[in-house]
UniProtKB/Swiss-Prot annotation:
Species this chain originates from: Shewanella putrefaciens (strain CN-32 / ATCC BAA-453)
Entry keyword set: Acyltransferase, Cytoplasm, Transferase
Additional note from the record: In the reaction, the free carboxyl group of octanoic acid is attached via an amide linkage to the epsilon-amino group of a specific lysine residue of lipoyl domains of lipoate-dependent enzymes.
Gene, per the UniProt record: lipB
Protein name: Octanoyltransferase
This protein's record includes keyword rRNA processing: no
MF terms in GO: lipoyl(octanoyl) transferase activity
Family: Belongs to the LipB family.
Length: 219
């Protein structure tokens, strides 16, 4: 669906701790107005478990030395760590005239389209948000909508240690197996995955102009 504003600002944040980026997302969402641009934040986090608003403590089996942060997104517990691409779409869905479910579908489809370039057959599930390959999960998804705008986003496993996922029931599903793109012949690095996902995401949502930035804007 074409957007009223066809410019998307891409912010390459590199490696950043989770909480500082989370608070920056909240600040951008709370202070943006009808003229504020849509942005896509691309980042890699140190090891952390994040527990969504629907999260149940019993799904954290053994956090060990990895911190657990309670956050304001939808969904259950997930893991972020080095070698995982994390993308936060900060989209004014009210201005863009797309619904929440449609945005979720677009995000999932952008991952599916990106993996298809590498001949990886991925798919979404109606009852379990995210993207899967052969019943193993390759990407997790959790959004929050506030003031008609989205924040939080997606995490794509690229080239990471998947062992910490065994310390939790990922997204609330006991025994859910995870997989990553490098093992499937997909993107080999977080940088490559970010570049390719930016293309499929912007194409799917109708953005025609991409403006790249290094780091966050000065607040």
């Amino acid at each position: 669906m074409p957007l009223q504003d066809t410019t998307l600002h891409i912010r390459h944040l590199g490696k950043q701790d989770y909480e500082s980026v989370w608070h920056a997302m909240q600040h951008y969402t709370d202070t943006r107005n009808s003229e504020s641009p849509d942005e896509l934040w691309i980042v890699e986090h140190p090891p952390v478990f994040t527990q969504g608003q629907a999260g149940k403590s019993e799904h954290i089996l053994n956090a060990g030395d990895i911190p657990v942060i309670q956050v304001d997104r939808g969904g259950q517990v997930t893991y972020h760590g080095p070698g995982q691409l994390v993308v936060y779409p900060l989209i004014d869905i009210k201005r863009s005239k797309i619904g929440v479910r449609q945005l979720v579908t677009h995000i999932e489809q952008s991952i599916i389209n990106m993996l298809a370039k590498y001949d990886i057959q991925a798919y979404a599930k109606a009852d379990a948000p995210g993207v899967y390959v052969n019943e193993r999960k390759i990407a997790s998804l959790g959004l929050r909508i506030r003031r008609g705008c989205s924040f939080h986003g997606l995490a794509l496993n690229v080239d990471m240690d998947l062992a910490p996922f065994r310390r939790i029931n990922p997204c609330g599903y006991a025994g859910l197996e995870m997989v990553q793109s490098k093992a499937l012949g997909g993107p080999q690095t977080v940088t490559e995955a970010g570049e390719q996902l930016t293309i499929t995401f912007s194409q799917l949502l109708g953005y025609q102009h991409l403006v790249h930035h290094q780091g966050l804007a000065a607040s």
